[in-house]
Design a protein with these regions (language model features):
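Mobile cap/lid helix-loop segments that gate and shape the active-site cleft of serine hydrolases
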Residues: 39, 177-218, 251
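N-terminal cap/lid segment of alpha/beta-hydrolase-fold proteins
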Residues: 26-57
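Short amphipathic alpha-helix adjacent to the substrate-entry channel of hydrolases
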Residues: 74-92
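Primarily recognizes the serine-hydrolase "nucleophile elbow" in alpha/beta-hydrolase
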Residues: 112-182
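Short beta-strand element of the alpha/beta-hydrolase
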Residues: 57-67
Length: 291
């Protein structure tokens, strides 16, 4: 067994758990540590939050991608879990962090999670036609790319999503302050930045790769709908990163909403107020729920 392995959840137990959710429980339930992929023997898992829906109904699904600078964090703290109370299934995923693999492993994992959800939609009562994504910080960076990167034409199962909620994610790696010398940052600082660890090089040394990993540089008219939320006091990711993505999406004719949270920093309580949740719910309802 690989040293990276985690116990595989047998399919029979997954099916049983799914049936139990539908028949015994009156509230959203979570099935944890489901393996969705094993690239190079490295086990990738997700937690699946299932809503209480009428018998025979399928649930629109939102993939939650955690933050942590691509090097930290896990699926265990799922900011999107409350959507299960609103009729959504939520898949909170782990992906390969930068000490395990460099770009594009991270986006490959996100897309494979979507394919897994579609392959297993019938088992868990998911609506395979209505899948969105939501992430914060580096997770916001990745869900924005899930909604903008070109899709593989030869995909046997599509990784396409319909809607993206991007919380304060970097959208243009070339202009992110930690990736550039200046304002007290040295060449050594930049070489050790999260962006350099993600790409395996500095943005100065590999600008084309940085563009491939930047939603701002990947916008096209057929992109997913976007809701972008960012604090105007964010010390980590400049507000301009979100504003410029929003503007480019709109110029391309892509539906995009921009919500600037006054006084908010890099995350915080402002993103989880009743008003913020209502904005997010209404956004996903518009693009993922069947009329």
């Amino acid at each position: 067994m690989s040293p990276f392995s985690t116990p595989r959840v047998p399919v029979s137990l997954l099916i049983l758990a799914s049936l139990l959710v539908g028949s015994l429980h009156a509230a959203p339930e979570v099935i944890r540590d489901i393996e969705y992929s094993r690239p190079g023997g490295y086990s990738l898992t997700l937690d699946l939050y299932l809503p209480e829906n009428p018998k025979g109904a399928t649930a629109p699904t939102v993939v939650w991608v955690h933050g942590g600078g691509w090097k930290n964090g896990s699926k265990d703290k799922c900011k999107a879990a409350w959507l299960a109370d609103e009729g959504y299934a939520v898949a909170s995923i782990n992906f390969r962090l930068t000490h395990v693999a460099q770009w594009p492993a991270q986006i490959d994992d996100c897309r494979e999670a979507v394919r897994w959800l579609r392959r297993n939609a019938g088992v868990f009562g998911l609506d395979a036609d209505n899948i969105g994504a939501w992430g914060s910080s580096s997770g916001g960076h990745m869900v924005a790319l899930m909604g903008t990167l070109p899709y593989e034409e030869n995909e046997s199962i599509s990784s396409r999503i319909k809607a993206v909620c991007d919380w304060y994610g970097p959208t243009e790696l070339l202009t992110m302050p930690p990736n550039n010398v200046g304002n007290g940052r040295t060449e050594e600082d930049v070489a050790n930045s999260n962006g350099a660890k993600l790409l395996g090089c500095t943005v100065k040394d590999c600008p084309e790769l940085a563009k491939q990993a930047s939603a701002y540089d990947q916008v096209s008219p057929d992109d997913s709908a976007f809701l972008i939320m960012h604090g105007d006091q964010d010390p980590g990711v400049p507000l301009q990163q979100s504003l410029q993505l929003h503007n480019r999406l709109q110029k391309a004719g892509v539906p995009s909403q921009m919500k600037v949270l006054v006084g908010a920093g890099h995350g915080g309580k402002e993103f989880e107020t009743k008003e913020s949740r209502e904005l997010i719910r209404n956004f996903f309802d518009r693009y993922l729920k069947r009329s």
